[in-house]
Amino acid sequence: MAGLKVFSFALLLILTFSLIDVEGYNVENGGSLCCNNHPKFGKCNTKNDDQRCNSWCLNGCDNGKGGYCKSMSHGGQCHCYC
């Protein structure tokens, strides 16, 4: 009987943590990239990077608006439009 309780608790923990996306995107919104800066995208300083960022946001954001390289104090980051 105790084994069943331990198994049930472990299963509950696994299911709970499987709903958390490690990269910080919500499961509820489909992992959409919208309205966020994305340091994981990599460098984003040139016109070519700007076009690559826009394509990346178009593919990963549900609103179809794309994105741009946003100037930041520590270098540019890809930012997807809201």
Curated annotation (Swiss-Prot):
Disulfide bonds join C34-C82, C44-C69, C53-C78, C57-C80. Coiled coil: none annotated. Residues 1-24 form the signal peptide. The keyword Signal applies. Keywords: Antimicrobial, Disulfide bond, Fungicide, Plant defense, Secreted, Signal. It is found in: Secreted. This is Defensin-like protein 22. Transmembrane segments: none annotated. Pfam families: Defensin_like. Belongs to the DEFL family. Its main location: secreted. GO terms for biological process: defense response to fungus; killing of cells of another organism. GO terms for cellular component: extracellular region.
